[in-house]
Amino acid sequence: MMQGMTRSLASLGRIFGPLAIAVSLLAGAAGAGACAAGKAKIPAGTAQPDNFLYERGTEALNKKKWMTAREYFQTIVETYPQSTHRADAKLGVGDSLLGEGTAASQIQAIQEFREFLSFFPTHARADYAQYKLAMAHYYQMAKPERDQTETREAIREFDIFFERYPNSKLRPEAEKFDRETRDRLSESEYRVGLFYHRARWYPGAIDRFQQVLKNDPKFTNRDAVYFYLSEALVKMNRPAEAVPQLTKLVEEFEVSEFLDDAHKLLTEIKNAPVQPASTPKADGEKEKQKPEAEKPKPAKQDPAVTVKPKTNP
């Protein structure tokens, strides 16, 4: 069959050119999509067709036959509104879309899980739907140097999960992925701060690093934030503020590539000469407290020179 299709496409290309091949391929894809969107067939005489469909859909889902599974589940949702499997079938549709792993299917999965939570808010598997909704955004997260919109959406959905379902059995798994999600966002902010640090724009670096620690105090790679924040503070002549950051690095991390440098920087700060603190004073008070030798003195007159008063001619 494939050989025949190849020969046909080759013939089209010779006669009508590349455009004919493109049109033929698009038509074939559309036809395949239409077949996939059709309803699943039920053997004649099946006593409980919804049970049959759900079992076949679950079997296909476990075998990662995403489109086949979706056909079975979608048929239940659309044809058997009173079925006890309808809610689970709705989740099955979402799972099959997530399984495909394309950007388009993940967007569709988000819609399916949102609809489930809207139609079945008190269902026993509502926590599962909320968890999968967060994961649908998680799978779309960009690299740290790219836009983090999906990362923020994932964090928001995980927060809703923890708030609504604090005792869910899915909580440990959700916490693991939530940590990865927050690390992605914090890593993105940290890299901006590191860019400023390397460009020697220390005020901007300090602001970014402090923001990371404020928003995500459990950031996995915060040892790097502690160290570069401390360096920037020292560069800005604020060593006293660097000491607590370096101390946290040493106390919180038994293993870190920054430990040796942190100890060195701490030692340098502690051994640096102490600058006396000066307090602003009024000009008159400053003048009063100056030693006598430092005060401005009138110019001395040479005794050999006599200054005569001017007289009018």
Name every feature range the model reports, one short phrase each.
Residues 5-9, 33-313:
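Acidic, polar-rich low-complexity tracts and alpha-helical solenoid repeat scaffolds
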